[in-house]
């Protein structure tokens, strides 16, 4: 059996809702759905994610809306970033943010979860948003490079775990590398 993992940069979850993203959720209902650029306060994210649960249930993907596991990290800078992750698979663990990054600009950019596949394997899935840098603004570039360095460290940890027989990892997102 395979699982479906989808990633979407929604460019604002409230705008995506106005455009009918909940209909897409009900039609496609991926096993894991990584979302970037949520750009909304927690209350708005919670209510929209609840609607996604109803869409998954209506589509027959889950028995009840509460069976859709939702996690997100809003950005502490209003109107910026924000990542989410929805899954109907069993959640084994959740982690928010990257270790060592505590500045507001680094919030809402990384969440990961360990899920159990129908075959019983555990995998790590991360929803990632790497902000765009701008060489005209050295501070923003320094922030981006610091985030990328920390992300590379975490990616190395995930790689090493997989190489030693541990969980495989899937990173989904908007990486803004160029």
Where are these regions (language model features)?
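Short, flexible loop segments at the rims of nucleotide/cofactor-binding pockets, characterized by
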Residues: 8-15, 101-102, 142-146
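Glycine-rich, phosphate-binding/catalytic loops in enzymes
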Residues: 22-24, 46-53, 142-143
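Structured beta-strand-rich core segments of catalytic domains in phosphoester-bond hydrolases
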Residues: 39, 44-135
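Long, well-ordered alpha-helical scaffolding segments within enzyme catalytic domains
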Residues: 143-155
């Amino acid at each position: 059996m395979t699982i479906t993992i989808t990633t979407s940069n929604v460019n604002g979850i409230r705008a995506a809702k106005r455009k009918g993203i909940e209909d897409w959720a009900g039609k496609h209902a991926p096993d894991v759905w990584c979302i970037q650029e949520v750009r909304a306060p927690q209350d708005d994210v919670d209510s929209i994610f609840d609607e996604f649960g109803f869409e998954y249930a209506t589509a027959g993907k889950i028995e009840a809306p509460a069976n859709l596991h939702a996690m997100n990290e809003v950005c502490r800078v209003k109107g910026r970033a924000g990542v989410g992750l929805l899954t109907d698979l069993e959640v084994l663990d959740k982690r928010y943010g990257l270790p060592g990054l505590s500045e507001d600009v680094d919030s809402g950019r990384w969440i990961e979860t360990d899920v159990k596949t129908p075959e019983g394997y555990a995998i790590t899935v991360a929803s990632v948003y790497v902000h765009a840098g701008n060489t005209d603004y050295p501070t923003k570039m320094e922030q981006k490079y610091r985030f990328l360095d920390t992300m590379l460290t975490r990616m190395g940890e995930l790689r090493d775990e997989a190489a030693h027989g541990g969980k495989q990892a899937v990173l989904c997102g908007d990486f803004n590398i160029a």
